[in-house]
A protein has these predicted regions:
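Hydrophobic beta-strand scaffold residues
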Residues: 20, 113-115, 146
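Charged helix-capping and loop-helix junction motifs
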Residues: 68, 96-101, 127-136
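Anion (oxyanion) recognition and catalysis
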Residues: 14, 100, 104-108, 139, ...
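Active-site beta-loop-alpha junctions enriched in small/polar residues
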Residues: 56, 87, 118-122, 150, ...
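Conserved post-catalytic alpha-helical subdomain immediately downstream of the catalytic base
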Residues: 202, 218-286
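Conserved phosphate/ATP/ADP-binding segment of small-molecule kinases
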Residues: 123-215
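A short helix->loop->beta-strand "cap" motif at the edges of active sites that frequently abuts
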Residues: 107-112, 186-190
């Protein structure tokens, strides 16, 4: 509350046509709460990318459902899909409970739940048992589950292919086996998706995706994309896929638009993309 950095963040969100709501937390002086920030080197050529997160005293750790009107959001406004990130669920015990309560409220009101596992090793250290229980409950309530091979193995204990493996195009079937295991473990979900990323160099990746929708499989074979900054590609995929679902397109287009949105995000130095229109995204797919 009253922080110029908070004001900057609010203005930045507004510039992207994103609304927010939540309690304004008193900073508590110079040594109180603050906003986390990332120090990121995108890399170039032979220099690989590196990221450092500074989260000491992060105000986001205080998220609490008491500060959000869940009845209004789910009961009156009729949210169609609520998206949860494993990064937030693992940030602190408070945010883990926050995500659980959001999932429970969404399930109660018949709102679809999307859950991107987003494993972060530093968040899980010495908290594996606690977080595994939280992630299992959220995943059990979810309609859409997203994660790469490492996420499914470390967050949910679903055996899969080697993380960061090579020759992904030749190992599509091993990813399908992993997704089938996830389908058996979490039968409520009807959409499972994973991205495929093979690093050729800092500025060139092989990028693909696999999605199971009911009994149907949709695969985008890995193909080379130019990369300015890899950060945000996975989130771009999820955002594009959810957008396509909300638009009511055929399932085949969900994964195509998601793939293209992720590819678009890697052409920006920011960790998100702001496409001018749908055509700009589709032009990347085509």
């Amino acid at each position: 509350k009253g922080s110029p950095i908070s004001r900057f963040i609010q203005d930045d969100l507004a510039s992207r046509h994103m609304d927010y709501e939540g309690k304004e937390v008193e900073q508590g002086g110079a040594w109180g709460y603050r906003h986390q920030f990332n120090i990121a080197d995108s890399g170039y050529g032979s220099r690989g990318p590196r990221v450092h997160n500074d989260r000491a005293g992060e105000v986001g750790r205080t998220l609490n459902v008491k500060d959000v009107d869940l009845q209004r959001i789910f009961g009156h406004e009729g949210v169609r899909i609520v998206h949860l990130s494993g990064l937030i669920a693992a940030l602190s015990p408070e945010t883990g409970e926050f995500c659980l309560e959001i999932a429970r409220a969404a399930k109660k009101h018949g709102t679809s739940i999307s859950f991107d596992l987003n494993h972060r090793a530093s968040f899980w250290e010495n908290r594996e048992e606690e977080l595994r229980q939280i992630f299992h409950e959220i995943a059990s309530a979810s309609d859409i589950l997203v994660g790469n091979e490492e996420d499914f193995q470390l967050c949910l204990g679903i055996e899969g292919p080697e993380a960061g493996g090579k020759d992904l195009a030749a190992n599509i079937d091993s990813f399908k086996v992993m997704i089938n295991r996830a389908k058996e473990a979490f039968p409520k979900a009807d959409v499972f998706a994973t991205t495929l990323r093979q690093v050729v160099s800092t500025n060139a990746h092989l990028w693909g995706a696999i999605m199971a929708e009911g009994a149907n499989w949709h695969v985008v074979e890995p193909r080379e994309i130019p990369v300015l900054d890899r950060i945000g590609g996975g989130d771009g995929f999820v955002g594009g896929m959810l957008y396509a679902i909300l638009r009511g397109w055929d399932p085949e287009k969900w994964i195509q638009f998601g793939w293209a949105s992720g590819a678009l995000a890697t052409t920006f130095l920011t960790d998100y993309a702001q496409p001018a229109d749908e055509e700009q995204v589709w032009s990347i797919w085509k």
